[in-house]
Swiss-Prot record:
Keywords: Cell inner membrane, Cell membrane, Crown gall tumor, Membrane, Plasmid, Transmembrane, Transmembrane helix. Disulfide bonds: none annotated. The gene is virB8. It is a single-pass membrane protein. This is Protein virB8. It is found in: Cell inner membrane. Belongs to the virB8 family. VirB proteins are suggested to act at the bacterial surface and there play an important role in directing T-DNA transfer to plant cells.
Amino acid sequence: MLVARESLAEHYKEVEAFQTARAKSARRLSKIIAAVAAIAILGNVAQAFAIATMVPLSRLVPVYLWIRPDGTVDSEVSISRLPATQEEAVVNASLWEYVRLRESYDADTAQYAYDLVSNFSAPTVRQDYQQFFNYPNPSSPQVILGKRGRVEVEHIASNDVTPSTQQIRYKRTLVVDGKMPVVSTWTATVRYEKVTSLPGRLRLTNPAGLVVTSYQTSEDTVSNVGQGAP
């Protein structure tokens, strides 16, 4: 578009005013966008904080179930809140499982038993057990039996010696390929503590939250299969 010379000054003023207005509009729009973004960020932060305070950290909680005399089923999430007979049953079952896996042996399930007994034990008890079971200890069932035999154990009785100590009698049967099984009876003395800070993965196999702090076992009798065991 041609502009007459006498109108150039006026035209330049109009162009300058237009550019100035556009610049102001752009700056104003940028400020509005920045304000909206800041509000959105603050809103997201507030929402995240609200969710974090309303939703507790997830953790694995064992639920204990038992059948009442009338046939109804009841449950509890804390072993300390169980009826006395039910709490005792959970502790007895957990301690027997520990003794059973520690004293029995089968090559196919040896790794599972080793891991559970280790996780169930206090550091000194765990160290003693692992030194006994691992190579190259000549007394380890891995060395003596390997895949040629197995050790089976059966529960006889459990008796509380003190509130945190239990004696468990069990029958032990040594089975070796090509030989007659040997049956013996043993007594394990287990001292334990109840803890509440076990990781969730350990609660799956140790719902009572027990840690064995001392473990001893002694042989009572030995007999061959076919003869009466005391």
